[in-house]
Each structure stands twice: as C-alpha cells, then as structure tokens.
C-alpha cells in the first residue's frame, strides 16, 4: 500500500478554494500506454484513490504496471458532531487531491488493451466523477 498522507506540510489547515477551469498540468500520458482521465472537477479522497488502485491491480495481476498520477495534498477539516458554530476551524480529518477536468488519475502499461479497458472501467466506478479511457499515441 502507498502512504497517501504528506510527510510534512507547511501549514496544518488550508482554505477550501475553488476548482475553476481545466487542468493544464498532468494531462498527458507520461508513463504507461493507457490512462484514466477526469472529465469533471472534484476532490478525490485518499481512500478513493487507494480503492481504485487496488481494483486495477487486482484485475491486471502480474505483468501490468500501474502509476497513480494524483496525490492527496490538501487537508480537509471536520468539526466534531453536535458542536456549535464558531470557536475556530475544525481539525484535519482526511486528505484530498484536487482534480480538475483533463487531469490523468491512473496510468497503466504492459497489458493488452481489453484487459486495461476492463481494469480501468472498474477503477472509474470507484471515482466520484465521470472519467474517460484514453490511449497514448
């Protein structure tokens, strides 16, 4: 398993920000032959990333290689239940990756196209957004 929390960050809490526009970086296939590309903006949690990676690796078995192209580096804070408003921001609860349209989530290589298509479609069903399967070249 991959550790999906940053080792150390400069600040413990972040603003939520907003996801405008499209992804200009990380939208080309760099490592593999097939890839899963996001079509919508979203926050993708570290658990969702890991679930997608596991689903893919279970499908390709040996021979295939998988690259995860996103990393959750944004802390999301949650305040305790039944707490009144005010008294500061909540505590960091989990990490998310900010994904914009066009961003490549996973890449895969070393397997035939039909197996890659099947594995990536299973991984895409774990994602909270619409995605598309793309082939390099």
From Swiss-Prot:
Gene3D superfamilies documented for this protein: Ribosomal protein L10e/L16
One Gene Ontology term of the molecular function aspect: rRNA binding
Gene Ontology BP term (one): mitochondrial translation
Organism: Vigna unguiculata
Keywords: Chloroplast, Plastid, Ribonucleoprotein, Ribosomal protein
Similarity section: Belongs to the universal ribosomal protein uL16 family.
Domain of life: Eukaryota
Gene name linked to the record: rpl16
Protein name: Large ribosomal subunit protein uL16c
Localization of this protein: Plastid, Chloroplast
PANTHER family given in the database record: 50S/60S RIBOSOMAL PROTEIN L16, LARGE RIBOSOMAL SUBUNIT PROTEIN UL16M
